[in-house]
Swiss-Prot record:
Summary of the function given for this chain in its UniProt record: Bidirectionally degrades single-stranded DNA into large acid-insoluble oligonucleotides, which are then degraded further into small acid-soluble oligonucleotides.
Name listed for the protein in its UniProt record: Exodeoxyribonuclease 7 small subunit
Keywords annotated in UniProt: Cytoplasm, Exonuclease, Hydrolase, Nuclease
Coiled-coil segments: none
Domain of life: Bacteria
Lineage summary: Bacteria, Pseudomonadati, Thermodesulfobacteriota, Desulfovibrionia, Desulfovibrionales
Family, similarity comment: Belongs to the XseB family.
InterPro entries per record: Exonuc_VII_S, Exonuc_VII_ssu_sf
GO molecular function list: exodeoxyribonuclease VII activity
């Protein structure tokens, strides 16, 4: 199955299995390189899917207008401070 045909969840699970195998350090060099390349492809695919999902998520602003979701604003709201402010 190609990377594009896999669901995000399956791609992420495969990426986790690759990371475990590479971290164990007991794979032959050639297999390790192949796993690394596959993993990098999965990372790119997952990032692209996450970005597409982020763009689809929107929130209603105070004036009722739809505004893009901003992770920094969400994290700041959970931390109790304005976005961009470090505590």
């Amino acid at each position: 199955m190609s990377v594009k045909e896999e669901s995000f969840e399956k791609a992420l699970a495969r990426l986790e299995r690759i990371a475990v195998a590479l971290e164990a350090g007991d794979v032959p060099l050639e297999k390790g390189v192949a796993l690394y390349k596959e993993g990098m492809g999965l990372v790119a695919s997952c990032r692209k899917r996450l970005e597409a999902a982020r763009l689809e998520i929107s929130l209603a602003g105070e004036d009722g207008a739809v505004v893009p979701f901003d992770v920094a604003d969400d994290e700041a709201a959970r931390d109790g401070g304005p976005a961009g402010e470090e505590s």
